[in-house]
Amino acid sequence: ITDHYKNRDVWTTLAVLSLLTNKISLGTGVTNPYTRNAAITASSIASINELSGGRAILGIGPGDKATFDKMGIDWDKPLSRVRETVLAIRAFLAKEQVSQAGFKGAQMSFTTSKIPIYIGAQGPKMLELAGAISDGVLINASHPDDFKFAVPMIHARAEKAGRKPEDVQVCAYASFSADKDPAKAVNASKKVVAFIVAGSPENVLERHGIGMDEARAISEAISRFDFKGAMDGVTTKMTEA
């Protein structure tokens, strides 16, 4: 479930879903290190894990600058922040005293079963970090070219960290749109595509032949809450990527 200030609260939603479902895994797709303290995030995901009978997954990534600008939050050192937060949360969940990332001996008062931590990643550095420290990687894409690029990088970094590549699960955060009328299906997907394009790093855009000027125009429209303008900027090439 997405963690975005414009949507329903992710933790409330996950709590309700924990009580209304029996088998599916439940998690954040994704939260971030900026809008919540790592100790609170650890407590929240541990609570969801208890409510759901051990079905929780914590998805965490760097978020996007455009959103944080609107919220008045400085998007500083995303790679370091994700790394520090993942390590701190893992320590909290193990009921260890945490004295890193600004904490001073903080500790949770309860434990729960192991919760996998997935890192949301697209760019090379974040993909490598995920290979080094995460239980899984949630890639905001579904095109085969993105995985041809990402998987070898993730596996190489996992091996460098002394891990087995198969210990890091690689997942696609896939978006789809279905309609009997193909044109309607494409049109319905454009808002989601616009947000993905606006939040994609330059190397991802280049891989799919999407110009920086096109992406910048969409990002600027979103920052103005001009969603129609953002959708109008979405091209066929973008929807197919």
Please give the residue ranges for each predicted region.
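Active-site-adjacent structural elements that line small-molecule/cofactor binding pockets in enzymes
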Residues: I1-A241
